[in-house]
């Protein structure tokens, strides 16, 4: 299992700034997903508990109020954290920061790295961890 605090072992975290949700670093990450068009149409059915959500907030470029709506919906689903590439918004609205702090969901801001590098780094770790757990269970069954 990988929790948000464990991201410190990844090089890309040097480019992350924790903007909110300091008390939620123990949340477990089960997958990495991108928030894109869902913020426009409000359909978050493809998101799940434990998702680490990465976005550049393009969907809210002309409607910043969509940020709060999207974050609120995703937090209610139980996502583990958000990472926002600061292309369109250099900072988040104060009500979004307050929501993340209140619900203890970490929100990171970043700029100088590719979204793909973050996704691949976390996904590779999750896969290798999953494989390790599988082989550990298999070995335990042989030894039992």
Specify the residue positions occupied by each region the protein language model found:
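Alpha-helical/coil-rich non-catalytic "connector" segments in signaling and regulatory proteins
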Residues: 1-144
């Amino acid at each position: 299992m990988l929790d948000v605090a464990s991201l410190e072992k990844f090089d890309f975290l040097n480019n992350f700034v924790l903007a909110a949700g300091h008390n939620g670093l123990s949340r477990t990450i089960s997958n990495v997903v991108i928030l894109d068009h869902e913020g426009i149409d409000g359909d978050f059915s493809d998101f799940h508990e434990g998702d680490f959500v990465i976005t550049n907030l393009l969907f809210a470029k002309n409607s910043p109020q969509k940020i709060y709506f999207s974050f609120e919906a995703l937090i209610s689903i139980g996502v583990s954290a958000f990472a926002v590439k600061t292309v369109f918004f250099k900072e988040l609205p104060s009500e979004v920061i307050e929501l993340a702090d209140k619900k203890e969901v970490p929100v990171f801001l970043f700029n100088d790295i590719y979204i793909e590098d973050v996704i691949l780094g976390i996904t590779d770790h999750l896969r290798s961890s999953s494989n390790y757990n599988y082989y550990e269970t298999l070995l335990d069954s042989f030894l039992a």
